[in-house]
């Protein structure tokens, strides 16, 4: 018993010393998400849950490694998001959902908290890493948002290779498209209206995004978001992910936010910038601001989803009003956290 107690004290002392030493550094932190929605433990096999957790951990560790070495927050979030874009598990890049016509249209945005510089792309079909192209728009163009064919022409000028759209094809996303179209036809037969039919689709068909927010050792915040959009979307629909202030926002004076959810609501309520404004002008904590917008503003009107937030002190908050949100975080004072379901 005494031996066990001594080991516990020694272990505790080491942890305390380690935390004290870490807290003396300039704070740095990163949080990521892989989308919010009807994500329930009963729907996962142990192997599936393990695979999702491993990919989330890989992404957050990749971004954290950049920060730990003194790298910029912009590089950290780009690195983390690229890991998620390369995974078929999440609705971005290789895991992008299908449009109604059976193709893939990708959106992304990024924002620099130092100066509010931002870049975004929407409706691209042949870009392997949308977040990288959004970064190039921010760094190498005089514009903020480029779309469709024009965005891809810009990509070619920047030396980005265009790829075939079918590289984003996955069996599980195609099966989801078929189910969505069947539901749409059934609802349309009743309503005689595509818009009304699409509104009646379950929330999971309307959500799915990846994103990251980070604070680096120099005190600079950044946020980025990437998505394949909404299953069975039509007419060139664009959601909140590439919209600065809705799906992405970062400002050193307040916080950095990346959102995931039913994009139309997040656009209408300027979710990302609203959270930052409450922090900046009302002196709210990110916990207060995030809870107010996600649970008090959006939830009552049917706006489902969540956000990840980091502030200038390295505090992290990840509120959501759905049954789950793929998420992970790490800071110089917090060990790696990975969560999927509520109450984790």
Locate the predicted segments by residue.
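Short, Lys/Arg-enriched, disordered terminal segments
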Residues: 1-5, 20-23
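Sec-dependent N-terminal signal peptides
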Residues: 4-13
């Amino acid at each position: 018993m005494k031996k066990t107690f001594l080991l516990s004290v020694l272990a505790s002392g080491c942890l305390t010393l380690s935390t004290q030493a870490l807290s003396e550094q300039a704070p740095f932190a990163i949080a990521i998400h892989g989308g919010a929605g009807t994500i329930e433990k009963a729907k996962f096999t142990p192997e599936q849950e393990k695979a999702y957790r491993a990919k989330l951990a890989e992404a957050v560790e990749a971004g954290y490694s950049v920060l730990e070495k003194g790298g910029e927050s912009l590089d950290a979030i780009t690195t983390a998001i690229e890991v998620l874009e390369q995974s078929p598990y999440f609705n971005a890049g290789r895991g992008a959902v299908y449009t109604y016509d059976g193709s893939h249209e990708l959106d992304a945005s990024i924002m620099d908290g130092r100066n509010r510089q931002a870049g975004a792309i929407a409706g691209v079909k042949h870009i392997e890493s949308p977040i990288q192209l959004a970064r190039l728009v921010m760094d190498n163009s005089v514009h903020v948002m480029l779309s469709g064919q024009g965005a891809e022409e810009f990509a070619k000028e920047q030396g980005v290779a265009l790829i075939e759209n079918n590289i984003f094809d996955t069996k599980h996303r195609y099966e989801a498209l078929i189910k969505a179209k069947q539901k749409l036809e059934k609802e349309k037969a009743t309503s005689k209206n595509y818009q009304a039919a699409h509104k009646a689709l379950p929330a999971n068909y309307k959500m799915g995004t990846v994103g990251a927010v980070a604070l680096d050792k120099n005190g600079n915040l950044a946020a980025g978001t990437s998505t394949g959009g909404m299953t069975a979307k039509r007419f060139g629909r664009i959601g909140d992910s590439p919209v600065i202030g809705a799906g992405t926002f970062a400002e050193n004076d307040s916080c950095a936010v990346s959102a995931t959810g039913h994009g139309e609501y997040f656009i209408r309520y300027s979710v990302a910038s609203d959270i930052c404004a409450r922090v900046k002008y009302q002196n709210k904590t990110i916990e207060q601001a995030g809870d107010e917008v996600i649970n008090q503003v959006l939830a009552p009107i049917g706006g489902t989803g969540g956000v990840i937030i980091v502030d200038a002190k390295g505090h992290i908050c990840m509120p959501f009003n759905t049954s789950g949100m793929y998420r992970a975080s790490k800071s110089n004072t917090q060990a790696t956290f990975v969560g999927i379901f509520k109450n984790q």
